[in-house]
Amino acid sequence: MASSLVSRPHLTQRPVRAATLASATRPRLAAGALSGRCQAQAAGDLDDAHYMRRCVELARKAAGHTSPNPMVGCVIVRDGRVVGEGFHPKAGQPHAEVFALRDAGNLAENATAYVSLEPCNHYGRTPPCTEALINAKVKEVVVGMTDPNPIVASKGIEKLQGAGISVRVGVEEALCRKLNEAYIHRMLTGKAFATLRATLSMNGIITNQIGKGADQSGGYYSQLMKEYDGVIISSDLAKMSALPLSREAGTNQPLCIIIAQGESSRLHIPSLSQEHASRAIVLADSPVTVEPAGVEVAVFRQIDLESILQLLAQRGLCSVLVDFREAGESFASLLNDFQEDKLVQKVVVEVLPFWLASDGLSNLAFGGSQSFPLKNLELRDVNGSVLLEGYV
């Protein structure tokens, strides 16, 4: 099957110059002054964490644009002052280190480079970042985490060390891993990172609604559509509502993966024009003609979530949101035992401030018969609704 993925638009990156940071005054250490050394070490650790968090902040500027590449940010620091910053804007464009070194210019010599992900050491669509750092004569590189990509995996660190550059790894590692959780998952499993999203009423009824302003610019649902490469929806939702999209400025729209199980021989998607047919792909369990023309159809002998995630990863998608709206029993069956099979990594549930009557409403269950706690559960208020996010 030919890929129907839409090429991502160029994300322009202007040099990002941070405000000059005043050099912190360090106490002079007398010989054997253990407490002074500990204070200096603690101050250095705080600086490292500060600059690495800035790397992550920079990297997030390209959210939704870099896939299948990771998001990466880089900060160049010399004599306690930020002299260069950069982030990777889009697959095929220069990496974060290159932009930061350009920003720093000659001030990169003898500086410390902070980067959220291990610098690459191979030729792809861009030259190795290790060579750029070596040629710039930086004295030290601080890395948030090693790259799980087997092409890179510690080779970049070894290259830098071989050139006499000091390398430290693991600063704010948990934050750096969360930044690229989808990329890491795809590298380690060969499957797209999957998040299940559903909406509940206060009395636990699964509903097709989403909260006030959620799908508008700045709303949580619009943000999700910006961050995820694809969204899996039921054919019933595709027939009844507009396809999910992000309202964020300059964003890329996710690929809509429409599940058509037990459909008739024809599927009409009223909200999709032929001009934008490449925005969607239909996965069916029998041959089906889709309107408008031009929408790709993939026929499976049996549709299951594992096969879908493998297919999407092969096409370069790192992340996908499973949107549980207008979900019939066949769509819900995709999620049977997802926890046991480790097919879904994250759950997002919106609880609306409504008590819904259950008469006549289907309250489908999903996830199989096993109970399990969510990890790292977070909740926040979003326009009167409560949004819960946790990991399986």
UniProtKB/Swiss-Prot annotation:
Functionally, this protein is described as follows: Monofunctional pyrimidine deaminase involved in the riboflavin biosynthesis pathway. Also has a reductase domain that lacks catalytically essential substrate-binding residues.
State the compartments where it is located: Plastid, Chloroplast
Transit peptide location on this chain: 1-26
Q: Does the keyword Nuclease apply?
A: no
What PROSITE patterns does the record point to? CYT_DCMP_DEAMINASES_1, CYT_DCMP_DEAMINASES_2
| Top-level EC class | hydrolase
| Cofactor: binding details | Binds 1 zinc ion.
Per the record, the gene is PYRD
Other comment: Unlike bacteria that have a bifunctional, two-domain RibD enzyme, plants have a monofunctional reductase and a monofunctional deaminase, each having an enzymatically inactive domain.
Where does the chain cross the membrane?
none
Task: Write the record's keywords in alphabetical order, separated by commas.
Answer: Chloroplast, Hydrolase, Metal-binding, Plastid, Transit peptide, Zinc
User: What EC number(s) does this enzyme carry?
Assistant: 3.5.4.26
Q: GO MF annotations for this entry?
A: diaminohydroxyphosphoribosylaminopyrimidine deaminase activity; zinc ion binding
Catalysed reactions, semicolon-separated: 2,5-diamino-6-hydroxy-4-(5-phosphoribosylamino)-pyrimidine + H2O + H(+) = 5-amino-6-(5-phospho-D-ribosylamino)uracil + NH4(+)
Pathway(s) the chain acts in: Cofactor biosynthesis; riboflavin biosynthesis; 5-amino-6-(D-ribitylamino)uracil from GTP: step 2/4
Q: Does the keyword Metal-binding apply?
A: yes
Report residues binding Zn(2+).
Answer: 95, 120, 129
Name this polypeptide is given: Riboflavin biosynthesis protein PYRD, chloroplastic
Q: Which residues form the CMP/dCMP-type deaminase domain?
A: 46-168
Q: Which species is the source of this protein?
A: Zea mays
**GO cellular component assignments:** chloroplast
